[in-house]
Regions:
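Catalytic cores of DNA base-excision repair glycosylases
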Residues: 1-164
Length: 165
């Protein structure tokens, strides 16, 4: 159904100009029905404020209503290959364990501290691949429950190794 949505609205201009009820009806099978309204609102804002070109930097993207820090970073990195960090739940866990030693609430660093650390780690070359790999690593190896510490390539420097669960 997502591909049908993209086929019907292949660009920002088409989405921005479509009747909202039509956009909502096309999206309905995908669930989370506030999303098409927000997407259309952003498409209209990009058309009006940026001449139809999606901004490249997280700072400019966050000026769009409804775009937060993570989404702005994701668009900047995955859409424009900009070397910006992405910190989702999985990445947060990897960085908390690897660089701060734990993932408990007593020792967990605040969100800004983790984002600042993540920013120092993103390579200038291939930030897309790096961010994807780090998210995948947190989802498959450094998992919330039963992390695979024995197979972890970060063992030699991970401050939480081995994680006891």
């Amino acid at each position: 159904k997502y591909h049908e949505f993209l086929a019907r609205y292949p660009d920002l201009e088409t989405l921005a100009e479509a009747p909202t009820d039509e956009v909502k009806a096309t999206w309905k099978p995908l669930g989370y029905n506030i999303r098409p309204v927000r997407l259309q609102m952003i498409a209209r804002e990009v058309q009006q404020e940026y001449g139809g070109t999606i901004p490249e930097t997280p700072a400019d993207l966050q000026k769009l209503k409804g775009i937060g820090k993570y989404t702005a970073a994701a668009v900047s990195c995955f859409g424009y290959n900009k070397p910006v960090p992405l910190v989702d739940t999985n990445v947060d866990r990897v960085l908390q364990r690897g660089f701060y030693g734990k993932n408990s609430s007593e020792t967990a660093k605040d969100e800004n501290t983790v984002w600042e650390l993540a920013e120092t780690l993103v390579p200038q070359d291939n930030p897309y691949d790096y961010n994807q790999a780090l998210m995948d690593f947190g989802a498959t190896v450094c998992t919330a429950r039963k992390p695979l510490c024995l197979f972890c390539p970060m063992q030699t420097f991970c401050l939480a190794y081995p994680v006891s669960t």
